[in-house]
């Protein structure tokens, strides 16, 4: 009953726009966290011919990608050695997070007689994962000279890309530039990549050999960006449900847990079978909006695990059981878009979409 409708045409159009924007740079499409909540398998199936790599957070996500298509997949996270035989046999790209990873990985490569493709992750200022900047060149050279590793890429991640004027962006870019110069001195074929969506939109000269357009591919734009071409990018999904019951309040009655919403006599409420148990934000209860038959209605009362209610007022537009309810709109300016919901709940679109769980059906249209 609860369905996330995904437009394959919009997804593909978004990726084509990005490809045009970044020129010759390769596309590494992040599909971690169930493709930001959109459904990993469906997204991979309908995008693989447009991208060069897929990127995931862990090995189980990598396996899911490869169950759909044979395509280069890189893991951003740590090397999970309990799966190393399958990582090697499937040519999954792994990230070197520390100098010591090289020797350990070499031992497994020798044992299985299989050279893995590696990307060296560098900490240029985010201070989360990756080889320390001061140890970068030594690590890159060691990986490049290894007889048992194939150094395919070198990358880092911007800490403040969502704020294009933040001085850390320039600091990280300058550090990465010096590493790129060293790396290209070893081989021009090593893929250097730094930018996520906000990175290459907010900073000049930052595409390098490859970009990693995650949130942009799914249709979400930074507020600061007004480029005409990029503005053609649109959200690819909308979340739908159905009205399952219409309730008419009597005088003095309320609705939901603690009865915090008190309506008027004769007020009608629509019950929608989706709640925080589906990953829909609980904070929206009593302040969010849904669209029923092109009319916006406010949520009423606390959201429960499995349901929410909306006020229809006197139901002048004759909402009925089984009418379609749009909970997340694909139109950014709407009051129920992921952008608007994120603003209401003090979070980001990534959070709104990626927390939608498997109780919600994903459907390509």
UniProtKB/Swiss-Prot annotation:
SUPFAM superfamilies: Alanine racemase C-terminal domain-like (SSF50621), PLP-binding barrel (SSF51419). Its EC number is 5.1.1.1. GO terms for molecular function: alanine racemase activity; pyridoxal phosphate binding. It holds the Pfam family Ala_racemase_C. Its cofactor is pyridoxal 5'-phosphate. GO terms for cellular component: cytosol. It catalyses: L-alanine = D-alanine. Coiled coil: none annotated. The keyword rRNA processing does not apply. CDD domains: PLPDE_III_AR. Substrate binds at residues 128, 305. Keywords: Isomerase, Pyridoxal phosphate. Pathway: Amino-acid biosynthesis; D-alanine biosynthesis; D-alanine from L-alanine: step 1/1. The modification N6-(pyridoxal phosphate)lysine is found at residue 32. InterPro entries: Ala_racemase, Ala_racemase/Decarboxylase_C, Ala_racemase_C, Ala_racemase_N, PLP-binding_barrel. GO terms for biological process: D-alanine biosynthetic process. The active site is at 32 (proton acceptor), 257 (proton acceptor). SMART domains: Ala_racemase_C. Belongs to the alanine racemase family. Catalyzes the interconversion of L-alanine and D-alanine. May also act on other amino acids. This is Alanine racemase.
